[in-house]
């Protein structure tokens, strides 16, 4: 060993190239000019992980809501335009999106929803997009996604993020503004743009125009379908004549078929449906062409690259101009690191420290025999009782060591799985569940446990399909605390299925 000494600073960062986030929150005077937020100032501050004074954040959210409230449930937008899919709190990739798609000051944009949850910079996405909406109300348009609701933001990450970075008041303001988001857009009188897709209860564009959107999306019905439905997994090659079948992946809404989409397009004189809602390896997908027009009947666009930091997918935006459609792809950008569920490093380290401390205690106690642990002056009759007490203490510490070991394994697994564990914990019993755990676990917990059981910390997720398979459980509508799926609403879902079957029968008769 040389006599060289190492000095470690407690104030400097280990990686000095990464600057500290700004400690000062931007004030009203710094952000607003002539009643509108200064977008460049806001962007430069948010990119550095800076925050705003709470009244400033609330002003942006509420002013954006006032504009959205005046828009129709189905807005009408013209080309040229850039259409964007899911963002999911990936703020630094959103900055890349605007580099690829063009500056919002001279480019018309349509976003298809899902701005929040899963990623760790959701509130930054909301504040920036809402600021753009305030500055460009006639050229930047925002639709609602299935994640813009109280139910999902409470289950996933957005509510927790708002509490940590701002307050629950900011979260509540976001929920109010989400209720104002339009549900669909008619692009150039040619394309229906929506987050999820079709509904058996929507046969015309007027059916969308008549919907009441100013509410929390229900667990069933046309609003739910616009936000949650998907094309059938064998879209364009269906083996059934049904137009709509139950969506087993989402646990709600429907799969819609190629014939259902073609019928809707023909009846409403449209070219195609443009939607988001599903991650795509290439960032987009063109589905089977309509026989009537020769144009893809359905297009999916997804704008969150390397989704959840594990999918390794490209993102894409769709540019439509002069009746020509171009897809522009882009890769992910580096972003600051957050521990799961916005945990601080001290809380995160407790299972690791606890495991070592209890392991040390067990080893110390195991060195000594029972006789050594009993004092010489103890009464002869109490020796047996005393030995049993000591054994019980050793067993208790051993159990505690096992608990900390499980917590440590869970922490490491969550760190490896990243966004695939959206609540920051593993499903109950993945590491230690026995018969009782299995008997009491919910269906969702059992499915999640089976999906990631046996996942090795040394294993690296290498493919898009593998990531999507592990994440499949998180694509479902989470269980509702008010048990809305039990009782009345389920009857409505059943009746909706009957309604869909009735429409399907009508469609078959019309085609025969």
From Swiss-Prot:
Region (Calcineurin B binding): 344-366
GO terms, molecular function: calcium-dependent protein serine/threonine phosphatase activity; calmodulin binding; calmodulin-dependent protein phosphatase activity; metal ion binding
Entry keyword annotation includes Flavoprotein: no
EC main group: hydrolase
EC identifiers of the protein: 3.1.3.16
Required cofactor names: Fe(3+); Zn(2+)
GO annotation terms (biological process): calcineurin-mediated signaling; calcineurin-NFAT signaling cascade; negative regulation of calcium ion import across plasma membrane; positive regulation of calcineurin-NFAT signaling cascade; positive regulation of calcium ion import across plasma membrane; positive regulation of synaptic vesicle endocytosis; protein dephosphorylation
Taxonomic superkingdom: Eukaryota
Region (Disordered): 471-512
GO terms under cellular component: calcineurin complex; cytoplasm; cytosol; glutamatergic synapse; mitochondrion; presynapse; protein serine/threonine phosphatase complex
Activity modulation comment: Activated by Ca(2+)-bound calmodulin following an increase in intracellular Ca(2+). At low Ca(2+) concentrations, the catalytic subunit (also known as calcineurin A) is inactive and is bound to the regulatory subunit (also known as calcineurin B) in which only two high-affinity binding sites are occupied by Ca(2+).
Reactions catalysed, as given in the entry: O-phospho-L-seryl-[protein] + H2O = L-seryl-[protein] + phosphate; O-phospho-L-threonyl-[protein] + H2O = L-threonyl-[protein] + phosphate
Chain positions recorded as Fe cation binding sites: 86, 88, 114
Modified residues (Phosphoserine): 483
UniProt KW keywords: Calmodulin-binding, Hydrolase, Iron, Metal-binding, Mitochondrion, Phosphoprotein, Protein phosphatase, Zinc
Motif segment (SAPNY motif): 303-307
Subcellular compartments: Mitochondrion
Family annotation (InterPro entries): Calcineurin-like_PHP_ApaH, Metallo-depent_PP-like, MPP_PP2B, PP2B, Ser/Thr-sp_prot-phosphatase
Homology family: Belongs to the PPP phosphatase family. PP-2B subfamily.
UniProt-recorded name of the protein: Serine/threonine-protein phosphatase 2B catalytic subunit gamma isoform
